[in-house]
C-alpha cells in the first residue's frame, strides 16, 4: 500500500475531504474513512454511506460527551478493542434522522457550543464514540485517530468515521484499500504514522521534580519526568553545560545488572562507566524504564531460563513471542527537546539507538564508544550483541 504524509492528510481534511486511516496489522487491520466534523458537509456522509458501507460513527473527545451528557451505551463494555460507544442520537430538528443531511446536522450539533443535552433524541441514527485522553498515544484506534486529526487541523475535537467494505460485504484490506484510494483520489495514512508524527511534534513529558544527587561517581542534578500517555517515570541526571552537542547516554533500566550487579550482561558496568564519563566531561544520562529491551523483568528472567537451555539473548526473546528489541526512544527524544537539545554526542555501541533518536529529530553529531570488560558469564551475550544485533563492540 502507498501511504501519504500526515501533513498531506491534514491539508485534505481542512479542505473538507475524507481520508483513509489504516490501523495495525495485529489489530483490526482495516481502513476507515475519516473526516473532520467542522470541515465536512452532507456529501461527506453520503459518500461514506454509499462507498464506505460501514457503520457511520462520530468520534468526540471526553469533554464533549460530558457537556452533552452522552452516557455509555453499555456500562460493562466487552468489545475486544474497548471501543467506547455512547447511546446513539438524533438532533431534535431532524425527522427520521437517517438521511445524509440529517446525520450531518446531528454531527454538527455535537460541536455547537449552544447545543444542550436535551437537544438530542436517544436512541438515534448517529453513534458517538468517546476517544481516550491523549488520543493515539494512549489507544491506537480509529476513534482516537479521528479526534487527533481534528485537533491537528485546528478544528474542534470531533469527526466522523466509517469502515470501508468491499462490494461482496467483506472488509477492505491491503490492495482493496489501495484500489479504493486510487479510485476516489483520497489520501491514506496509518495510525502508526500518526503516532510517530505526534511524538515528533509534541512535547508530552512533564518535569515533576529536580534535586541535587550526590553519588559514588560524582554530584549531579536529577530531573524526574512523567509522560502524558503512560504511568512511566523517567529520570535524567545532568552535569555541566548542555548547550553545545552535549554528551548523552540513554540507559535502559536493568534491575539485575544496575542494582544486583549481575554478570550476565554489561548493563551495570555501562551505567557506572557512563556516570564516570558524564561526571568528568559533562552531559546527561536518561534512565529509561525498558527492562529486558522492553519485555519487562519477569519475561527477562524467563528469557534467562531459555538461555540456560542453549538459546541466546535474541532467540530467547523470539521464542517467548517478542521481537529481539521492543525499545522505542521517543521519550528520550522528548526529554532532550525539553532541554532544547537537538544535536548530541551519543554514548552507545548500539546503532538502533542512533536510528531511534534520529527518527524523532535528534541529530547524532558523534558517537562515543562505551566499552566495558567482559566477564566469564557474559561472553556469549556480548558475542550475540555484536554478531546478531550489530553492536559496535
UniProtKB/Swiss-Prot annotation:
Cellular component aspect of the GO annotation: cytosol
InterPro entries to which the protein is assigned, alphabetical: DHBP_synth_RibB-like_a/b_dom, DHBP_synthase_RibB, GTP_cyclohydro_II, RibA, RibA-like_sf, Riboflavin_synth_RibBA
Marked site: Essential for DHBP synthase activity: 125, 163
Keyword annotations from UniProtKB, A to Z: GTP-binding, Hydrolase, Lyase, Magnesium, Manganese, Metal-binding, Multifunctional enzyme, Nucleotide-binding, Riboflavin biosynthesis, Zinc
Region GTP cyclohydrolase II: start-end pairs: 201-393
MF terms (GO), sorted A to Z: 3,4-dihydroxy-2-butanone-4-phosphate synthase activity; GTP binding; GTP cyclohydrolase II activity; magnesium ion binding; manganese ion binding; zinc ion binding
Record-listed Mg(2+) 2 binding positions: 28, 142
Active site residues of this protein: 325 (proton acceptor), 327 (nucleophile)
Cofactor binding notes: Binds 2 divalent metal cations per subunit. Magnesium or manganese. Binds 1 zinc ion per subunit.
DHBP synthase: annotated segments: 1-200
Binding annotation for D-ribulose 5-phosphate: 27-28, 32, 139-143, 163
Residues annotated for Mg(2+) 1 binding in this entry: 28
Documented EC number(s): 4.1.99.12, 3.5.4.25
Any Pfam family hit: GTP_cyclohydro2
Binding site residues for Zn(2+): 254, 265, 267
Reaction equations catalysed: D-ribulose 5-phosphate = (2S)-2-hydroxy-3-oxobutyl phosphate + formate + H(+); GTP + 4 H2O = 2,5-diamino-6-hydroxy-4-(5-phosphoribosylamino)-pyrimidine + formate + 2 phosphate + 3 H(+)
The protein's required cofactors: Mg(2+); Mn(2+); Zn(2+)
Binding site for GTP: 249-253, 270, 291-293, 313, 348, 353
GO terms (BP aspect): riboflavin biosynthetic process
Function: Catalyzes the conversion of D-ribulose 5-phosphate to formate and 3,4-dihydroxy-2-butanone 4-phosphate. Catalyzes the conversion of GTP to 2,5-diamino-6-ribosylamino-4(3H)-pyrimidinone 5'-phosphate (DARP), formate and pyrophosphate.
Annotated family: In the N-terminal section; belongs to the DHBP synthase family.
PANTHER family found in the cross-reference section: 3,4-DIHYDROXY-2-BUTANONE 4-PHOSPHATE SYNTHASE, GTP CYCLOHYDROLASE II-RELATED
Protein name as it appears in the record: Riboflavin biosynthesis protein RibBA
Lineage start: Bacteria, Bacillati, Bacillota, Bacilli, Bacillales
Gene name in the database record: ribBA
